[in-house]
Amino acid sequence: MSKKVNNRTTEYPIDDIFLKRYSPRAMSGEKVSEKELMTLFEAARWAPSSSNIQPWRFIYAMRDTQEFENLFSLLIQFNKDWCVRASVLVVTISKKTTDSGRENATHSFSAGSAWQNLALQASEMNLIAHGMSGFDYEMARKKLGVPDDYTVEMMIAIGKHGKIEDLPESLRPRETPSDRKPLKEIVFKGKFPA
């Protein structure tokens, strides 16, 4: 039995939390409080992690600060056009090694789990958390002093919902929940298809 929420239809019934979450860009510029932000990071903290290594780290900056301007400067122009109304910018990084110095092959995967928890919590709190890859990774590493044994993974724009009219006209048609590939394209029994 399928389910429809937010103009998204599932092939099997799942909890609404997964269908409600999407990545809008229209933000109001209104401040997200420190308490709201720490609640998002608390959700991220409880993500599953291989061997409980918890390799994720977050560097954040609040709007109207020099730190925010530093993070904003890392973005490509496309993302600057809509992130101008974000309340918080976050750089997600992950530690490539364990505490004993061994390689952690799943550090990026674990950081992705933490990001997913943060995104779901934001959706539950009626906040936007929009993940981005469009930024200067090497400049982020330099500006933020990220050590060599860490990988810069992604950036996140966090904010309160705004008006679609405040977005550049070219982005307005994209301000809707997107669909997903059917299960038959992503799930294979026994081995990868030929």
Spans of features found by a protein language model:
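Acidic, surface-exposed loops and disordered segments
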Residues: 1-194
